[in-house]
């Protein structure tokens, strides 16, 4: 009986000794995968790196996902961009399409409640990125309107409007039926801008600045 108990105790002590080794191997493998490939990192707090200090950016967003963007040709490093979970990162900004319908003003209030604004689009690359997130069957409000002065378009986040970087559908904008707001709509196999009544209800896209910090590849 004593021999059997001793053997059982001896056998029982072998496996616990392996646990730290297994854990170490798994941890090293995971960390290696993170640094070798583009790594998604989820954090519990939405933080911004500013002049060497980490400060809390927003109480609304308590978890973020960070993605490493590859360096541009000729660059010596790249950028990590962190966005709230479920938001999509692109060139230091975060984007979030919503699938319920609201008026333009309701949409902007909804985005503001998430520490963001209705989306601004300032480049063709940004237009192409945003539209790949959308459902072609629906229209989506942009953060662009000319409610104050007809024909003087303004972005809701005060970004300067560039009349040379626009994606209007042919014949737009035409202010038909007091169309003072703008939607993204898929027409003739491409996404374009249409002026649109602000009180109509459609889907929307919110945008906020991401948390960014630079990285350099190891030599």
Swiss-Prot record:
Gene Ontology molecular function terms on file: D-mannose binding; immunoglobulin receptor binding; metal ion binding; pattern recognition receptor activity
SMART domains documented for this protein: CLECT (SM00034)
Gene3D superfamilies: Mannose-Binding Protein A, subunit A
The organism's place on the tree of life at top rank: Eukaryota
Keywords of the record: Adaptive immunity, Calcium, Cell membrane, Disulfide bond, Glycoprotein, Immunity, Innate immunity, Lectin, Membrane, Metal-binding, Receptor, Signal-anchor, Transmembrane, Transmembrane helix
Tissue: Constitutively expressed in myeloid cells including dendritic cells (at protein level). Expressed in the macrophage populations of bone marrow, spleen, lung and lymph nodes.
Cytoplasmic side stretches: 1-20
C-type lectin domain location: 90-207
Membrane topology: Single-pass type II membrane protein
A single GO BP: Fc-gamma receptor signaling pathway
Quaternary structure (record): Heterodimer with CLEC4E; disulfide-linked. CLEC4E acts as a bridge for interaction between CLEC4D and FCER1G to form a functional complex. Heterodimer with CLEC6A; this heterodimer forms a pattern recognition receptor (PRR) against fungal infection.
Protein's name in the database: C-type lectin domain family 4 member D
Taxonomic lineage of the native organism: Eukaryota, Metazoa, Chordata, Craniata, Vertebrata
